[in-house]
C-alpha cells in the first residue's frame, strides 16, 4: 500500500453510513471493498461484541480502538473495557474535553486518572485525542502538555494533525517532542480557510509526515474526515487511493 501496509479509518468519518447499516459499512470499507485494514470506533451502533468481532474478521479489519467521552467512561467503564477486550481492540481514547485554563486541566486529570489506571490494569491502553483548544498556553505551557504531564505514565497521545495545524503549531516538531507517547496519528487534511479537505487537496505533505512519523515509532495511521466534496464514502475511497499512491 505504498508507505503504509496498514491504514485505518475513524468511523465517525462515515457516521451517516454506519447509522443506516453498521455491518454493511464495514463490508464496504474492508478487504472486499476499499481495502482499509482497521477501524477506530466512535460508538458501536448497538451491535453486540460477538457480532462485531465476526464482522471485523470477515472483512479483514482490526479494531484499533474507540473514542469514548469522559462521562461515558465514568458511567460505563467496566462495560467499555469488556467490549474492547471482546473485539480485541487496543485503545480507549478520550476524544474531547473542555478546557480553557490550567485549573480546568488539573480537574480533568483528576477525573481521567482513575479511568486510565483501570483501563491499563485491564491490559488496554488509554489515550487522549486533541482538537485546537488544547494548544492554548497557560503559564507558558500548552494545556495539552499540562494534561499529559498530570496523567499516568503510559497514557497515549493520538495527535490529530489537522487540529495542531489549525492551532498554528509546528506539528512535526511537536510530534518529535512527544514521540515517546505518540502512538496514533489522525491523518486529516487542512486547506484554505482552515477547512477539512480531501487528503490530496490541502497543505499537509502526508508523504513527509508519514515517513517522519514512522521513524518516530508511530504505530497507527487513521483517516478522519469531517467534511466531504461528494459523500462520506467517496471521501473514504479517495483517501485510501491517495495513501496507496504515496
Residue ranges and their predicted role:
Residues 1-32, 45, 50-51, 57, ...:
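Histidine-acidic metal/acid-base catalytic patches
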Residues 8, 38-40, 65-67, 93, ...:
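Conserved beta-strand positions in the central sheet of alpha/beta enzyme cores
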Residues 11, 41-43, 68, 96, ...:
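Short glycine-centered, acidic/aromatic-flanked micro-motifs in structured strand/loop junctions
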Residues 27, 35-38, 55, 70-156, ...:
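Active-site acidic/histidine proton-transfer and metal-coordination neighborhood
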Residues 8-20, 66-73, 98-104:
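Active-site mouth loops of central-metabolism enzymes
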